[in-house]
Each structure stands twice: as C-alpha cells, then as structure tokens.
Amino acid sequence: MTAAKPKPTPTAAKSAASFLYHALHWTLRLSALAFIVREAYRIRLYAITDYGRVIHEFDPWFNFRATQYLAANGYEAFFKWFDYKSWYPLGRPVGTTIYPGMQITSVLIWKALNAIGAGKLPFALPYLTGAGAATTVAWVTEYDVAMSLNDVCVFVPAWFGALATIFLGLLTYECARGLKITSAAWAGVAAAGIMSIVPAHIMRSVGGGFDNESVAVTAMCATFYFWVRSLRADDPHAHRWGVVTGLAYINMVAAWGGYIFVLNMIGVHTACLVAMGRYSRKLCYSYCLFYFIGTAGAMQVPVVGWTPLKSLEQLGPCLCFLIMIALEVCESRRRAGGYKFLSVANVKVYLAVGIACAAALAAVVAALLPTGYFGPLSSRIRGLFVKHTRTGNPLVDSVAEHQPATQAAYYQYLHYSTYPAFAGGALCLLGFSDAKSFLVAYIAVAYYFSAKMMRLILLMGPITSALAGLALGFAADWCVDQALLPIGGVFKWAFPVMLGDAKAEEEVEKEEEGEKAAAADADADADAADKKKPAAAAAAAAAAAGPSLGARLTRWALLIYNSVPVCLLRMAAAAKLCQWAYPHGRTFYDYSHQLAVGMSHPSIMFKGKLQNGETIIVDDYREAYWWLRDNTPEDARVMAWWDYGYQLAGIANRTTIADGNTWNHEHIATLGRALTSPEKEAHRMVRHLADYVLLWTGGGGDDLAKSPHMARIGNSVYEDICPGDPTCQRFGFMQGGVPTKMMSDSLLYRLHSGGQQKGVFVDPNRFKNVYNSKYNKVRIWKVLAVSEKSKAWAADPANRKCDAPGSWYCVGRYPPALRKLFKKKGIKKKSFAQLEDFNKKKSKKDEAYQKAYMDKMAGKGGAGGAGGAKQAQAAIREAQEKAKAAAAKLPKEQQAHRRRRRDAALAAAKAMKWADSEASSQMHKLVAAGDTTSLEAWITAQPDVVHLRSADGRGPLWWANELGQAKVAKLLKSYGCQKTLKDKGGKKPSALLKKNKKAKKAAAKKANKEEAKEVL
C-alpha cells in the first residue's frame, strides 16, 4: 500500500488558503478599482477632446478670473479685493462674497506642477545573463508636468471627479463593514464603479466646467467618509477621526455654499442615533470634535463669518452640539454614581441638567431675538420647504435649476442605478449599525430636497451609488467566490472552507466569535461591565452542554451548500447572473457616456452643420466678447442681462452691470427696468450706466426668452413697470408670436430685432449697431450721447462710501444725475429684501404684492377682464397691419442677417444624429405626457435636445403635432425647434399636425353618426 502524502497541518492549510484566497480577491478588486478611476477621469474629457482646453458656461468664468487674481496678487490682496469691473457702479467685495476653496486648491496645484516642471527620471533594472553574471539595464524617462493656470482649471473637475469616486468607495466600504452577507471591499469597488459614471455626478464635473460643485462633491464624500469612520464599532479610538472630519468639512465650507447640507446631514444622523437609543461616548466625542473644529474653521471663511451661529438653517446642528454636551454631562454623572438608566437618581440628574440648559438657552434666545441677531431662511432654502413651486422671489424663480425635480429627471440622471439602490437600502437594515444608519438618513434627506429643487439631484449621485454598491458588491463577491471554486478543486488544501473542511469551519467560527466579542467589549459601557461575570458563566455552561440545535442545523446546511453538486449549481447560477447583468451594465455604461457627451457641449460654443453638410463650430459668443476686448476702451461699460456678466468680465475684460452673483436684487431690478422700458425712457437711464449694450439674439435661450423674468424682477422693486400685475403678463407675445405693445416698445425688443424684423427700428440718435456676430447669436449696440459727467463721477474714488477711513471696503454709488432722473420721474424704489426677512415687519401692500405674485404664478386669477380677448385680437390685427406696411422698408443687408440667423438654427438642428437612443425615448415620453415643466428644465440645461431626432428622422416637434400636444409644440418652437426640416419620409412636422386634425375631425364625425343612430 502506497504511503499517503503528508497533508499540510490545519494551521498551514489555513494560512495558505487565507493568503491565496485574499490575494486573488484583492488582485481583482485593485484591478477593477484602477479601471474605475481611469474611467472616472476619461468620461469627463469629452469637452476637452472636442473643443480644446476651454472654460465652459457662465459661473466658471468668474471662478477662473478669481483664480487668476489670486495667482497674480496673493492671498492678502485676494481677500481684500473689491472688484469695480462688476456690478457697476456699486462694485462687489469679492473677498467677502466668494467661496475660495476651489481657487486656493487650483493655485496650489498649479504652483506644485510648475515647481516640479520638466526633468529626467532615471530607471535601472538588474538581471542575470545566461552565464550567471549580473548586469543592469538603465534608461531615462523625460517628463514635463508644468501647465498653464487655464489648463489646470480646465482639468480640475476631471481630477476631482476621480477623487470623489475613491472617497465614495471608501464611504461604502466603511458602511458595509460588519455586513456578513457581502464583502465590504467589493461593495466599495461596486459603488465607486457607479459613482465614476453616474450622470448625476458628471453633470457638475465635466472637463472645463470649473464650478464649485466639481470640487465640493469630493469634499462632501470625504467628510462623510471620515464621519462614519469615526463611528467604527471595533475601534476604541475611532472618535479621533472626528478631528479629520472637521478638517474635511472646513474644505467643504470653503468650496461651496452647499456645506449647509453636509452640516445638517451629520447633525440629523447624530440626532437620529440619539433618538434610537444609540447614544455613546464615542458618538458624543466624534460629533463634538467635528462640530467644534469644523465650525471654528468655517467661521474663518469671510463669506461665512458668524452665520453658523446666526442663520436658522445652521442652528439645528448647533443645538445638537449643545444637547450632546448636556447628555455627556448626565452620562458622566450616571457612570460616576453607578446609577441605572431608569433609576430615580438618574432621572433627577437628567431633569436638573435639562432644566438648567433649557433655561439658559431660553434666556439667550430672548435676549438676542429682538435685536434681529438670528438671520432668516434664505429664499433658496425656503423654497425647499414651501408646498408650491415658487419661492416668492422672481429672481430665484427665474433659474430653471431651482424648479422641482420630476421622476423623469431622476431617471435621466440616475438611470439603472436606482434599481439596485433599493436592494442596497434593504441590506442596510440587516446588521444595523451607526455607519449603515447614515446611508438611510442620507437617502431620505437627499431625496426630499432634490425633489424640491432639481439642482440638488447632484446630491443623489453619491448615495445612489453607495446603496447600489452594497447590492452589487454582494453579487460580485458571491460570483467571484463561485469562479474560484475550480481553482479550489485543484488546490483542495488551499480552500478548505469553500470545500467543506469541518476543522477549518470551526476555526473560522471561533475567529468570528472572537471578533464579535472584541467588538462588543470595545463598545460596552458601565452597564455591560456589571453583567460581565454572569454572562461569562452562562457562556461556559452553554459550551459544556455541546452545540445547540441551531448550530447543528447550520453545520449541515454548510455541508450541503459546499457539496460538489451544489457547487456546480452555484457556478452555473453565477454564470447566468453575469450573463443577465452584463447587458444592463453595458446599457448603463453606454447611456452614461452618451449623456456625458451631451453634458460636455459648452453653451459658449457648439458644433453644427450648415445646409450644405459642412460641419462648423458656432463660436459667436466668444467672438463677440473678443470684439469688445479688442475694439472698445478698457474702461468701457457693457450693459447685458446678469447671466452674461461673468463671461463679459472674464473674456472681454470689460466692466459689467450685473452678473451671476445676484447679491443685489434691487440693482438687477434696475437693469431689468432699463431693458424693459420704452426706448426713449430707457436711453435716459442707460446713458448714465453704460457705453455699450450686448444682447443674445440667437433664439432658444436668448434674451427674448428671458424677457418675462426681466420684467418680473424689475417690477418686484419698481411697481410702476407693470402696475397691479406682479407677473407682467402684458410684457410678452400674443397669439402668432406678435409682441404686445409693452414688448414692442421696449428697448430689449428694439435692440434684439431692430433692422432685422419687419417694422422694428431703433432711433439712430440714441443707439448704433456696431457688431452682429457671424450667425447672429449676439448683437452689440453703442450707446450714443453717453453722460461723461456721470461716468467720471462714478470712477472717482472720492465718491465711494467706505466702511472706515482708509479701508479697502468702499462701495460705489449711483451718479447724482441718475438719482435726479428717478426723482424727477417720480420713480419709487422699494427694498425687496424685506419681503424675504421675517425679522422685518411687512406692510399690507407688500403682503398683497407677495400674495398676488404667488397666485398669478400658480395660475390663479384672470388675465385682466372680460374684454381681454377682444383687445388681444385687436392688437394682433394692428401689429400685423404695421408689419405689412413696413415690409418693403427692410434693407437687403438686413435680409442677410436673417438668413445667417436661420442658418445658425438649422446648423444646430442638424448637429444631432438620427438614432434611437435613451435620450430620444425619454424625450418622446415627456412629449406624450405633455410635461412642459420637465421639458423646459431639460432644454434649459441642454439647449440642443430640442433638435433630437430618432432613427426615422422625427423629433419632438413631429411627436407633439402627432399627439396633439399644442403647448409642447409651442414651447419647442420658442426654444428654436425647426419646423421646416423633414423626416426620413420627407414629411415636415406640420404634415403630422394636419393629419392629426383630420383624424380628430373623422373621429368626431364618426361619433356624431353613432350618436345619431342611437337617437333613431
């Protein structure tokens, strides 16, 4: 009989199994993570690949300009920067109104890269020759990491998008620890994979989109990770991570105003844990360290200052901080006295401390409340709690991102990731812990607020990825284990657990029990210490009695689960699961890339095709700004709607009237008054404020589309613009696209369409057309008869109002001539801020205005009387007659402008490929549902979607006509959807409208016949 080969000892077998098993798993995990991080970076580079290293949109141009100023002038000058090239003539104290985190980070990266610069890196690789002699191969690699500041700012969103992916993976890993049914590491990898490409994150982190959120999401994920790390159950010193949490939170505060969400999220989580009876010294120390360090650091950011201790939306976490201290005082007394929790002595301690704290808090509030110390909820924050879709502030309501989110929006930005997220949420309820409860609280709060404001869908990206990662991590862990079974069959000694080795199972069980006991001991308090001896005695008695019935059943179940037939079934099931999951994962991957391409189209330039098929880049906006930079004096003042202020200052380097900071509602209202007033009256104002007027005139989201907001914002301060009508319904267009009298007389309409539309002319003594862009997207007019006296007065530093002698904080003032003009005309201005501040008493007139505005925006109230329809029809006829009379007066060169404008619109329409896609399917659903709110929000975010075409060549306008959605069709046309294009069969959208009308007539005729038969 052949002697049996010596088998490895159980200890050696276990060591080998553990090493090989974990080595294979970690090799797969690290390989997957490397691919994920690379993908997170690559998917954000479409804009850079297609359009070059260009800063996008509006806000990023201010951020870049501020970064340039910081790099050139240093920190001290930056925080004392009063910018007189914006918000003319008032100026803006940039140093105290900016979140500087992104600028500081970008400058540090830029300096570091340029400090490293270019160089050579030597490498040497020793090896043995065939003769056994040692030799070395050496080579030199050249590198150059130096970059311009522009390039650093362009790449920052992509870099931090990849970094946010890593932190989200760590957060998920930490929350998944202790969940026996899945591997925490695989859960982290799966969550990172989703986070890397989920559109909800990409929409704020594409290359060139140098906006605060691109850095802030990384800071938010880091803060949340360090917070849950500070609550780790099996680490007695985990609370020290509260210090790191506070430091990460300071970075978050410096980066974005959304830090309020992070602060309240951690506060809510802490309060929930206390309410569930999970208070512990670790929780108290972690939260207090975070709040104290984080708040102290946040108050050093000038734009924040004392608001954490004054603003209502931040006082909740402050109250939680005080309660945690009071609870710890009570618990310390209880531990010192050895009281039981429900004992009379302990109740007395809690009552005494509670009453003392409540009395002290009430005294402080009573003393500060009459002084106006506590600030009100801002209009944006209030909009998250009101029941309607309006905040009462027409400036806030004018921004599409501030409107409520729809289910279509969730699907658009989260797609398939929502389905495994539901399963992940259920997994959080298994093995409930402090860390996993954070995910439950996060999803509840984030969903509520994102439903109120579409912009906050950004917050859903990380939590959806984390929850989906829990579910997919479980599936990935199980599938990898099944894939390793054949290897375990070859090296049976290496995988004893997987193949049912009883001794190895016992060792594993003992280890798990030991880890569980260690974790329980680490978190035990005084009560547990009292029960330690009886528990140990009970455990010894149970061990002497032998394994329980449950333990025996578990062992038999493991033996069956690890039997060869079941192992084969498990392998087959894993293969089938992968086969089923791959197409869905691929669809999500392709959809995310498709949407990333759409999100990477900068609004400042776009691709298109002319009628002859030539592909072009429409760069009208930058060319207009360059024209201003190269052809106007350096001190030229340019009036434009506030949307374009950042780009004007950043690219043209010219003085602007207002920009996206929107810090002064009354000043924007003055700008709105100037643009919506009749030409003659407007010129009397404009000549004191500007040398040039710039308008976007390219259809879709141009200035005419924004005109209702201009009038409403202006009317909120100057009630004589639209007396008795807070929504300014008289300033707009009637049936057939005919402007109302107020619109046709306005400076905005005259400068927008003057000389290009029939019957629209501009007074040559007041304004001169000096520039029209190639595709008529931008028009620039020079203001004639400018008041040089007012310009000189505003430029004189002596006329600025400083907060102290010699201070840098000196606010400009309106020229006396403009103030006299307002006084002479009897123009009265009110402070809109009082309508938002509940600390100030509102007059009955203010309350009536607010109520009327809300009612009008909600669709309540009439259009202005019974004769409104007749007056509108009369106005239409009058306008049509005027247009016919003036048709012959249109010069030939102006006809050329109209042709170029039409070509630009057609170019945009033909830029989209004909293909059946997720986007076209989603568009068809919205059109079919008549969901104009979601459509307008989508179009505002991505203007080119109006030109989507399916494989048959049809787009949203065809579908709207076919389905009888007249309101949708009107909306699409207002955003530049072309009605002259043809589908694959050569049909125009109007053909389907006629067909739909015929079908309705036929159906009505048939119904009448059937009704007549029934009567007979």
Where are these regions (language model features)?
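Start-transfer (signal-anchor) and selected internal transmembrane alpha helices
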Residues: 1-47, 58, 333, 342-358, ...
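Ankyrin repeat A-helix N-terminal signature
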Residues: 925-930, 959-965, 992-996
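Alpha-helical transmembrane segments at the extracellular/periplasmic loop-to-helix junctions
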Residues: 312-334, 348-438, 524
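Membrane-interface coil-to-helix junctions
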Residues: 34-163, 198, 211-214
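Membrane-embedded helix bundles of polyisoprenyl
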Residues: 33-41, 84-85, 138-150, 154-278, ...
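Extracytoplasmic
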Residues: 5-7, 14, 116, 120, ...
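Transmembrane signal-anchor helices characteristic of membrane glycosylation enzymes that use polyprenol
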Residues: 18-60, 65, 72-75, 82, ...
